[in-house]
């Protein structure tokens, strides 16, 4: 008699293996343990394999730890817990819950306002807010996390409750009554009809949960309600509860959108704060997600319909809600991309990052890197001033020899933060992996610290040319090493492949690209003569091409004059230069009769534009300075400290004993921050050095420092550019700052 075939042996072996396996489900409470035991028994009686066992944990966090330690295998978690489990313990989501076929494995967190109001997402500070409950996903975690992550809400020392209580002009946050900020966070709550249960995280508080938070808005207690996408439609147009005392119409409410606009309440797919992922079953990275789904799929096939002996998606028999799975679950589905990032999604991940601040992990000090004796003195005074106001974390001052030395010390975890300019931000990010935590903001009219780099030409229809046709033209530059006059335009032309330096000889390459130029310089040694060919010197013809005002074509005004007087065909200047010297703004004889409409800009796309269209037609925007830190530093804590500090010390006329943005008391300039700074600002979505600097500025820097410098052929479009900085060239010829 022949034995079993190979295929049959494999099947028998697989059944033996599965029969010997078990999935240990982690329960977080006695009622959940009870339901888990019943589910295990139901699965066993139905012959579902592998067998299901129940492990008792004390909380979701404890269960995650048990799974990571291989003492349990699976648990269903909400989005916030999935984020922590994935980020801290490497767990992965494998099975998702479905609640509503319209939105599938997710729902949407929205901010609702009355249509008659003028509130937007950018004007929430000071308004009255209605929340479903403390630490609830839609009513608290998403809106608060989003406001923090987007920079609208600053948090000092991880004290989110205080930050929210200071931000809104009163709130109802059911469950916040036991906190230190209950006066503000419970101010709008009213309890039940007899005034009992005020601010309880239960139905005793009339403004609790989704419908309660919306009622808080509808009755005029609050100005904005943070609820889910279906809440308004479930409580208006004839569905309003009689106890509310009024009939509500959905058309009387609108949603706040992330871009500052508003939309109808039916437009929640396009206008929301975040898509909230459904709960999901998580397991260790080495666990077969397909096996878990097959187990649960067999279970839901038998035990998710009415009349079945066990109800997987009901907790009514146990006197609780949402045990093992949410009671609103209609189906369990397999997750294709089993990473916590993919499951949670971009919007929700960003909101969670805004809340990821553990006071117990917050370092007591923020070590600031300083570069000079005056800066040490100012930093010391800043540390004392912050300490007196109990600002956290406290400041410590650590000296370094140079910006690059600061970067090295930050990377080595010897220092935490330093304020850097554009080129140094590039080096800090690309070479040392640092990221921006906060930025400087200057006055809108301050063109010396925040501006666009533009290429200006005469409006000439008969001899018009584009940026791609600059070879052989005559060029006017503010000076060698000036950001708008040299670094950005030359870098942009190199990056686009028009100028190709050989053996790092940028000067010769530029001199051969243009027919003639005026590029004033301090030290003309080994300087190509054509780069001075258009320069005119002073009125007596002396000091030709020197890197100061004795050369009439020096600086941005001088470069424009070079163009005006027909010495050059193109001038590389700031976007304000034309306006500063035309239409009567400059009374000097050469500029007195000039009109701005007689000039145009050359755009990177090959077009020309009016000089007023500089925001859309420029070579790059010079970025503001930024505070740079290690990527593991909580940037919201850094900004939270600076934001609270500038409320006290940011005004140069404040009476609090220290001026953050003024260096005059220390006999220096731009110490710790540029003196022109009006406010420190959050980085928002610009969380990388490339994001902060902007693509055009980075491209210009990479053009100046790329492999093209060594004579390599221009890369194909989209090819990476390798950094090879040119410190020797800059040190040899760099003139004073322009």
Swiss-Prot record:
Positions bearing Phosphoserine: 462
Pfam family, one: Transferrin
Positions annotated to bind Fe(3+) 2: 421, 451, 556, 625
Record GO cellular component, one term: extracellular space
Domain Transferrin-like: 23-357, 366-706
InterPro entries reported for this sequence: Transferrin, Transferrin-like_dom, Transferrin_Fe_BS
GO biological process: iron ion transport; negative regulation of substrate adhesion-dependent cell spreading; positive regulation of extracellular matrix disassembly; positive regulation of plasminogen activation
Signal peptide span: 1-19
Domain of life: Eukaryota
Coiled coil, from the record: none
Covalent S-S links between cysteines: 26-63, 36-54, 130-216, 172-189, 186-199, 257-271
Binding site for hydrogencarbonate: 132, 136, 138-139
Carbohydrate-modified residues: 38, 135, 515
Residue span of region Antigenic epitope: 20-30
Keyword Iron in record: yes
One MF annotation (Gene Ontology) recorded for this entry: iron ion binding
Tissue expression as described in the entry: Found predominantly in human melanomas and in certain fetal tissues; also found in liver, epithelium, umbilical chord, placenta and sweat gland ducts.
Pro-peptide region(s): 710-738
Assigned keywords, A-Z: Cell membrane, Disulfide bond, Glycoprotein, GPI-anchor, Ion transport, Iron, Iron transport, Lipoprotein, Membrane, Metal-binding, Phosphoprotein, Repeat, Signal, Transport, Zinc
Residues with lipidation of kind GPI-anchor amidated cysteine: 709
Protein family according to the UniProt entry: Belongs to the transferrin family.
Annotated function: Involved in iron cellular uptake. Seems to be internalized and then recycled back to the cell membrane. Binds a single atom of iron per subunit. Could also bind zinc.
Name of the protein in question: Melanotransferrin
Species for this entry: Homo sapiens
